[in-house]
Amino acid sequence: MFREGSRDDAALVKEGLFDKLEIGIASDVTIRDKWSCGEIKKPETINYRTFKPEKGGLFCEKIFGPTKDWECYCGKYKKIKHKGIVCDRCGVEVTLSKVRRERMAHIELAVPIVHIWFFKTTPSRIGNVLGMTASDLERVIYYEEYVVIDPGNTDLVKKQLLNDAKYREVVEKWGKDAFVAKMGGEAVYDLLKSEDLESLLGELKDRLRKTKSQQARMKLAKRLKIVEGFVSSSNRPEWMVLKNIPVVPPDLRPLVPLDGGRFATSDLNDLYRRVINRNNRLKAILRLKTPEVIVRNEKRMLQEAVDALFDNGRHGHPVMGAGNRPLKSLSEMLKGKNGRFRQNLLGKRVDYSGRSVIIVGPELKFNQCGLPKEMALELFEPFIIKRLKDQGSVYTIRSAKKMIQRGAPEVWDVLEEIIKGHPVLLNRAPTLHRLGIQAFEPVLIEGKAIRVHPLVCAAFNADFDGDQMAVHVPLSIEAQLEAKVLMMAPDNIFLPSSGKPVATPSKDMTLGIYYLMADPTYFPEEHGGKTKAFKDEVEVLRALNAGGFILKDEICGSRRDETGRGIHIHEKIKVRIDGQIIETTPGRVFFNTIVPKELGFQNYSMPSKRISELILQCYKKVGLEATVRFLDDLKELGFVQSTKAAISMGLKDVKIPEIKKEILKDAYDKVAIVKKQYEDGIITDGERHSKTISIWTEVSDLLSNALYSEIKKQTNSKHNPLFLMVDSGARGNKSQLKQLGALRGLMAKPNGAIIESPITSNFREGLTVLEYSISSHGARKGLADTALKTADSGYLTRRLVDVAQDVIITERDCGTLNHIEVSTIRQGSEELLPLKDRVYGRTVSENIYQPGDKSNVLAYAGDVLTSAQAEAIDDAGIESVKIRSTLTCESRRGVCAKCYGLNLANGHLIGLGEAVGIIAAQSIGEPGTQLTMRTFHLGGVAATSSTPEIVAECDGILVYLDLRVVVDQEGNNLVLNKMGALHLVQDEGRSLSEYKKLLSTKSIESLATFPVELGAKILVNDGAAVTAGQRIAEVELHNIPIICDKPGFVHYEDLVEGVSTEKVANKNTGLVELIVKQHRGELHPQIAIYADANMKELVGTYAIPSGAIISVEEGQRIAPGMLLARLPRGAIKTKDITGGLPRVAELVEARKPEDAADIAKIDGVVDFKGIQKNKRILVVRDEITGMEEEHLISLTKHLIVQRGDSVIKGQQLTDGLVVPHEILAICGVRELQKYLVNEVQEVYRLQGVDINDKHIEIIVRQMLQKVRITDPGDTTLLFGEDVDKKEFYEENRRTEEDGGKPAQAVPVLLGITKASLGTESFISAASFQDTTRVLTDAACSSKTDYLLGFKENVIMGHMIPGGTGFDTHKRIKQHLEKEQEDLVFDFDSEFESVAG
């Protein structure tokens, strides 16, 4: 099916001297005359006695070449001197046996056979060309019905189907010669050959212009695309029917003799034999003038045999082999993980590599790894042989090998010499990000295990419990140079995903450093002494050494010598440093001996987070080399100090808080009160469950804090070892500590629901049998989840890599004026991600001034922000910054360095050719796998991340913004809408209206912002002054209340008992509650409020959702602020990353979420218009233009807006997640990009994973690359077709130059799988998924792959056009680029207008 050119091009192909690859459909002539070396007529394979190939069979030497080098079949010619001679006896050419891997043959078919790919792959290519349905075609192809090819003068129609009875009837009526009707492949061949594609194309275009129905247009456009593919290529449609079948070279389908006279064979041989047998039988039958029924059956069987050969199982039952296993057809050879693409072309096994178990090598330098001598000897063998020959120690390779095997002394000397400066690559599977392969200088060691530096373990995610690593030797000078310059471990100390240090001390090292740097615990004054003062650090170190620095003495923890000198390592001392007297400890002075001087004196405790910050600071101030030295010193110091400190944990170190009994008693009392409330009917069962869980969550936190305070206390001026371990970040966390000494807390059932009664014991006290049994659920769920999710995460990474693999940095600056706007991310009043972190390393698109001072420029347009600039912008209180982004980059291919910003792995501007797409995919995929390993449980109120009350953080004035409130009888303000917030502003003596105006125009910044929920009770009036710590509002956590805002009398509307409502007696309380239930009728349950008891004047209506409990009675008089009904919030299940990974997948695959929310299509005011077919009609009316937009909303959905609410375009009207496609259609590209980036970040942020926005932006960019044609104008584009933005603009430019009408299009959001398959390169798409469909599609339109991306070049064995290969590739491709002029488009602003 590939068309690489004639046989003469084979040499070029072998050399790799081609820069594009075209695929097409092979004609019968090509198969027979160009590809084939002979026809196979017999199904035989090899002779059972001689084991030699049978002549004319599937392994024939005459056709395929000799099985032994330079030897013919009969043995007449046996030497290289006869090269090229064709034996006159056996007809075999004397040549190399490897030609049997290249030479093909063919089978001449008795009747034409339809290629199953073109008929069965959706959409059916043959069906679309002929305009026939797949089922009709199937009946013709498999000899069930006739199809009319030429109706002649009869009343039949071309392509009409005739069954046997009808056919006989027609023959009787008109005679056999009056028309032509056939069956099978022959019929399809004739129909395809007679099809005039040019006129069909014109006819389809006409019909497309005239058709108004969207569905019909889409159908026509699809057919048009296939027909156009044939017309514009050199393919003929009848080539989709085969007259000859190519036979794969025999060495690609080997027959291997096993012990005991049996053979192992490739499944293809069986499939070919079936075809040959049936074909030969059919030829014989046709010669014998056999009855039509038998012939027809034989033809059908041949068609099925060829189907099975190409794609077994695609039609009918698959052909089974031995052991009832389906045979692997040609399609299977290409498809899936074990297919040709992924197994052999994208992933090859590598020579000069080995693997072994890893152990820790604390004595190594950062750039070293320990390589076992035996391994090194094997890996560096060729280098050793060359050196031995150069030295004259040996003269032949064989003798050198023998010498190596003997282990002669000079071999070891040579090995030592060679290994110097020759880096090796270490790799640990799974390689989730680029830090999974790093280069090291090998150091020869005894033993059989590879030694690894402890600081690189984090990057490899390695531990020493039996992990294995692979070693690879870079052979060429270039490869060695790349490994040295780019891949050495010291160059990879920062994560490319976030720029945070990855080589940070952990476990023992952290503990040792923390111990050394701990706060003073020994104060001489308390022991009747005096604080010692030292003139400099050297004196302190002398005193330490004099004290022996061994910590045994009970009182002060040091060993004094005879003169009474010596100091405690944690003693408070004074010392002069840089001319200043500082209070510190000897430990800190000791630690500072390894800190680079530029960083100053570090005089504070050092948990792991601080160490990480110190490393980052060190890199910024003193550069890479000094940082790596510092890291090695940290490692050394950490291990030594943790060993000397000999910190170990005993059972007594786990202190149980004394207040535990009291707190538990109090909690049981509270739970009893909640239960009583439920029994009295005040709250629902859901609320009771929810409140109970809140109580226990609070108890858990209280006890956890009490325990932490308890172990923080020092005894005998010594630290609690448990506290040291947790606080330093070496091992354990607060939650594990809580389980050891406080209580285990709430547990989840296997289904995720939280069990109300917690485990009140801790591990020190021991668990009861019941408690142990409950807690075993969680432990098992964790393990099962881990196993299942790792696969999901790996698949997500694969899809991400595939969609972004060809995004590389192609130029320095694209010159775009487009930008995106970023601001601080807040949750309530808490700052989750400060602005400085979001803008660091990004390019500013316009000047940034100090607010109120235009002369002070903080950053100029085009600046890539440094951390100092980012900090200055944040400090200046600037709300948002306009930055350039890959989302708005206008590079012709790939993206530009300026739009991308800094390379986070080294803090420099990203270089040309850098594979940023793959880095982005790895950055998002790698934590996915990590997260699946830990399952987080957030239970009860913790899960809703909200608290029952809002407290002012500082003094100020409270301003209500966008809030509708009603004052209840107690004088509290109740919130009636969902979108408002409370703002705390500085008291500047302004009026309330001024404050509101300034806030809504963002002219002033609030000190704190509190978003408030529907039904919240605000305790302070609008505009009132509040003080820090004052309660501002109470939030209703367990119900969504429906509150009345006007006085009047209640009237039930459509609240029909037994239909839309039901009275339910509460099992526990015995009280009867009126609950609105789900119903199918045309009822619209609502409560109407009338001004008078006669129900004449209507004041307002309130829609009541299903599941709500009604709190008022018919005819009851009510006051504003009273509760009409309440909708209990569902029992809160535990959240874990199971919610996270599928959510990320859902976002990047652009799937429609379940129970999606409805969003407003225009700005306006909400109104209701009754009910239609179980759906509520909600109208948004624009007050100014009078424009209306109707929304049909299911009655089961909960509305979060009410009549009269003002909404803005894109605002949610109901609960649930938003459909991304709707955001695109309603709010435009910019809003969608912002939404997707923030939503993905939200998932990772919840897990405490830090990923830079730019990585997610690249994936989103790839999802928004296509546009959908809405009006093709005079272009060659088709209606409903998805085309690349660049292609669209180029086509429009051409059309406009020719004076034609340009096409119109709207942006379209594609999921990553669809986007990967829509890539320009068919090789890349075929190696991803749907291999057969992609290849069929490409072959029909004779697609050309210009080999511009990574995957296609790896598959073709070329150098990849990225990294160090970028420049080389650029030169090769320059002539291609000349053909296509460089264009810079302003895509996004154009589309904004279309979408908006």
From Swiss-Prot:
One Gene Ontology molecular-function label: magnesium ion binding
Database matches in InterPro entries: DNA-dir_RpoC_beta_prime, DNA-dir_RpoC_beta_prime_bact, RNA_pol_asu, RNA_pol_N, RNA_pol_Rpb1_1, RNA_pol_Rpb1_3, RNA_pol_Rpb1_3_sf, RNA_pol_Rpb1_4
Subunit structure, interactors included: The RNAP catalytic core consists of 2 alpha, 1 beta, 1 beta' and 1 omega subunit. When a sigma factor is associated with the core the holoenzyme is formed, which can initiate transcription.
Matches recorded under Pfam families: RNA_pol_Rpb1_1, RNA_pol_Rpb1_2, RNA_pol_Rpb1_3, RNA_pol_Rpb1_4, RNA_pol_Rpb1_5
This protein's record includes keyword Transcription: yes
Binding-site residues, Mg(2+): D463, D465, D467
GO terms for biological process, alphabetical: DNA-templated transcription
Protein source organism: Chlamydia trachomatis serovar L2 (strain ATCC VR-902B / DSM 19102 / 434/Bu)
NCBIfam families named in the record: rpoC_TIGR (TIGR02386)
Residues binding Zn(2+) 2: C814, C889, C896, C899
Protein name, as recorded: DNA-directed RNA polymerase subunit beta'
Swiss-Prot/TrEMBL cofactor(s): Mg(2+); Zn(2+)
Coiled coil: none
Residues reported to bind Zn(2+) 1: C72, C74, C87, C90
UniProt-listed Enzyme Commission number(s): 2.7.7.6
GO cellular component terms, semicolon-separated: DNA-directed RNA polymerase complex
